[in-house]
Protein backbone atom coordinates (compact mmCIF):
# COMPACT_ATOMS: atom_id res chain seq x y z
CA UNK A 1 0.00 0.00 0.00
CA UNK A 2 1.39 3.37 -1.03
CA UNK A 3 1.03 6.02 1.62
CA UNK A 4 0.36 9.47 0.19
CA UNK A 5 1.44 12.03 2.74
CA UNK A 6 -0.09 15.42 2.28
CA UNK A 7 2.65 17.50 3.85
CA UNK A 8 2.36 21.23 3.33
CA UNK A 9 4.44 24.02 4.77
CA UNK A 10 2.41 27.12 5.37
CA UNK A 11 3.04 30.68 6.38
CA UNK A 12 0.58 33.42 7.29
CA UNK A 13 1.11 37.17 7.54
CA UNK A 14 -1.65 39.29 8.98
CA UNK A 15 -2.37 43.01 8.82
CA UNK A 16 0.17 43.88 6.13
CA UNK A 17 -0.32 47.57 5.24
CA UNK A 18 -1.10 47.06 1.59
CA UNK A 19 -4.09 46.99 -0.69
CA UNK A 20 -5.56 43.57 -1.40
CA UNK A 21 -5.63 44.23 -5.13
CA UNK A 22 -1.97 45.26 -5.27
CA UNK A 23 -0.91 42.16 -3.33
CA UNK A 24 -3.07 39.88 -5.51
CA UNK A 25 -1.38 41.22 -8.63
CA UNK A 26 1.93 39.82 -7.34
CA UNK A 27 0.52 36.60 -5.84
CA UNK A 28 -1.16 35.65 -9.13
CA UNK A 29 2.23 35.63 -10.85
CA UNK A 30 3.83 33.09 -8.48
CA UNK A 31 0.93 30.71 -7.78
CA UNK A 32 1.75 27.20 -9.02
CA UNK A 33 5.42 27.96 -9.73
CA UNK A 34 8.45 26.25 -8.26
CA UNK A 35 10.19 27.76 -5.25
CA UNK A 36 13.29 28.89 -7.13
CA UNK A 37 11.29 30.31 -10.03
CA UNK A 38 9.07 32.26 -7.63
CA UNK A 39 12.13 33.78 -5.95
CA UNK A 40 13.50 34.97 -9.29
CA UNK A 41 10.16 36.47 -10.28
CA UNK A 42 9.70 38.26 -6.96
CA UNK A 43 13.21 39.72 -6.94
CA UNK A 44 12.74 41.23 -10.40
CA UNK A 45 9.22 42.61 -9.92
CA UNK A 46 9.05 46.40 -9.59
CA UNK A 47 6.08 46.40 -7.18
CA UNK A 48 6.23 47.32 -3.50
CA UNK A 49 4.12 44.27 -2.64
CA UNK A 50 6.79 41.86 -3.86
CA UNK A 51 9.18 42.37 -0.91
CA UNK A 52 6.83 41.20 1.91
CA UNK A 53 5.71 38.28 -0.27
CA UNK A 54 9.36 37.38 -0.94
CA UNK A 55 9.98 37.27 2.81
CA UNK A 56 6.96 35.00 3.24
CA UNK A 57 8.14 32.58 0.56
CA UNK A 58 11.57 32.41 2.25
CA UNK A 59 9.87 31.75 5.59
CA UNK A 60 7.62 29.03 4.18
CA UNK A 61 10.65 27.28 2.65
CA UNK A 62 12.48 27.49 5.97
CA UNK A 63 9.43 25.97 7.70
CA UNK A 64 9.38 23.15 5.15
CA UNK A 65 13.05 22.30 5.52
CA UNK A 66 13.29 22.69 9.30
CA UNK A 67 9.97 21.33 10.53
CA UNK A 68 9.23 18.69 7.90
CA UNK A 69 12.62 17.85 6.45
CA UNK A 70 11.62 18.68 2.87
CA UNK A 71 14.16 19.64 0.23
CA UNK A 72 13.87 23.26 -0.97
CA UNK A 73 14.66 22.31 -4.57
CA UNK A 74 11.55 20.09 -4.79
CA UNK A 75 9.08 22.65 -3.41
CA UNK A 76 6.42 24.50 -5.36
CA UNK A 77 3.73 26.99 -4.35
CA UNK A 78 0.56 24.94 -4.14
CA UNK A 79 -1.73 27.63 -2.77
CA UNK A 80 -1.35 31.36 -2.32
CA UNK A 81 -4.17 33.62 -1.28
CA UNK A 82 -4.69 37.22 -0.23
CA UNK A 83 -7.65 38.21 1.91
CA UNK A 84 -8.86 41.55 3.18
CA UNK A 85 -7.73 42.51 6.66
CA UNK A 86 -8.90 45.16 9.04
CA UNK A 87 -9.31 48.75 7.91
CA UNK A 88 -7.63 51.34 10.11
CA UNK A 89 -9.54 54.60 10.18
CA UNK A 90 -7.88 57.95 10.79
CA UNK A 91 -9.23 61.48 10.72
CA UNK A 92 -7.53 64.15 8.67
CA UNK A 93 -8.26 67.72 9.76
CA UNK A 94 -9.67 69.95 7.04
CA UNK A 95 -10.66 73.59 6.74
CA UNK A 96 -13.36 75.19 8.92
CA UNK A 97 -13.12 72.58 11.65
CA UNK A 98 -14.19 69.66 9.52
CA UNK A 99 -12.42 66.34 9.17
CA UNK A 100 -12.23 63.65 6.52
CA UNK A 101 -11.93 59.94 7.10
CA UNK A 102 -8.80 58.21 5.81
CA UNK A 103 -9.03 54.43 5.42
CA UNK A 104 -5.78 52.45 5.61
CA UNK A 105 -6.43 49.00 4.17
CA UNK A 106 -4.57 45.90 5.30
CA UNK A 107 -4.44 42.36 3.99
CA UNK A 108 -3.73 38.82 5.15
CA UNK A 109 -1.43 36.68 3.00
CA UNK A 110 -1.25 32.87 3.12
CA UNK A 111 1.30 30.81 1.20
CA UNK A 112 1.40 26.99 1.10
CA UNK A 113 4.39 25.03 -0.21
CA UNK A 114 4.23 21.37 -1.24
CA UNK A 115 6.78 18.90 -2.48
CA UNK A 116 6.61 17.87 -6.14
CA UNK A 117 5.54 14.29 -6.70
CA UNK A 118 8.27 12.08 -8.09
CA UNK A 119 7.15 9.49 -10.61
UniProtKB/Swiss-Prot annotation:
The organism's place on the tree of life at top rank: Eukaryota
Keywords of the record: Chloroplast, Plastid, Ribonucleoprotein, Ribosomal protein, RNA-binding, rRNA-binding
Cell location: Plastid, Chloroplast
InterPro entries for this protein: Ribosomal_uL22, Ribosomal_uL22_bac/chlpt-type, Ribosomal_uL22_bac/org-type, Ribosomal_uL22_CS, Ribosomal_uL22_sf
BP-aspect Gene Ontology terms: translation
Secretion signal, residue range per the UniProt entry: none
Principal cellular location given in the protein's record: plastid
GO terms assigned for molecular function: rRNA binding; structural constituent of ribosome
GO cellular component terms attached to this protein's record: chloroplast; large ribosomal subunit
Binding partners and assembly: Part of the 50S ribosomal subunit.
NCBIfam families: rplV_bact
Role played: This protein binds specifically to 23S rRNA. The globular domain of the protein is located near the polypeptide exit tunnel on the outside of the subunit, while an extended beta-hairpin is found that lines the wall of the exit tunnel in the center of the 70S ribosome.
Protein family: Belongs to the universal ribosomal protein uL22 family.
This protein's name: Large ribosomal subunit protein uL22c
Organism: Phalaenopsis aphrodite subsp. formosana
Amino acid sequence: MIKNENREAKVLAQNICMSVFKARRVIDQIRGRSYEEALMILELMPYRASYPILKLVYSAAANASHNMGLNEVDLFISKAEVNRGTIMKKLKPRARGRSYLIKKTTCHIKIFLKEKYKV
